[in-house]
Amino acid sequence: MAERHPERSTEAFFGRRRGKRLRSQQTAAVEKLLPRLKLDLSSPAPAALDSLFGKPLREIRLEIGFGGGEHLLNEIRRHPDVGFIGVEPFVNGMAKLVAALEGEAPPNLRLYDDDATKLLDWLPDSAISRIDLFYPDPWPKKRHWKRRFVNKANLDRFARVLCVDGQFRFASDIEGYVNWTLLACRAHPDFRWVAKSAEDWRHPYEGWPGTRYEAKAMREGRHPAYLTFVRV
């Protein structure tokens, strides 16, 4: 079994915490909804993770670095019987998502606005059915590669919290980071790449809504890859 608290990097996996000044509507949404949806890690995680949502749920999924929230919003509406935990340390991304909720706190959504490794270390074993990591910061300079989120320590974290046959999904338009992730996951004993042909990773996931970042990448001639790994 992977250890509960693997090594944590001394440098954050994310860059700035804040970008442009928030609009008044976004500020109001953050002040109203984030306290209601934010997870409190000061107490141990419950063994039955759906108790965080106050109702029985079919499964719990995790999205790390949800950006503007396009995919996460689409998923919580498509699957009301599934619990979703969204992690986004960038203030502007969190503000976009909560503003899009239009004052409603979906019962199947919980949020966390800090380092995802803290949340991963807090979660109980085998509690998550799927982890999504889409378009993470590629940290293109070689001296910054140690800050890429996909690494041995974080794959150990994923392996601990994912149930057997759970999925880790990764999408990126940066070929170097795609290859990096393939090599890391194929070298890890707890993950298996499920692609049987190139068509399996060239096309978006079922129900994929697209994102603004993805659209920009494609306009600039970069072609995303959509990888899926299974916890064995």
UniProtKB/Swiss-Prot annotation:
Ion transport keyword on record: no
Record Pfam families: Methyltransf_4
Catalytic activity: guanosine(46) in tRNA + S-adenosyl-L-methionine = N(7)-methylguanosine(46) in tRNA + S-adenosyl-L-homocysteine
Binding site for substrate: 141, 173, 211-214
Known role: Catalyzes the formation of N(7)-methylguanine at position 46 (m7G46) in tRNA.
HAMAP family cross-referenced by the UniProt entry: tRNA_methyltr_TrmB (MF_01057)
Protein name per its UniProtKB record: tRNA (guanine-N(7)-)-methyltransferase
Species whose genome carries this gene: Chelativorans sp. (strain BNC1)
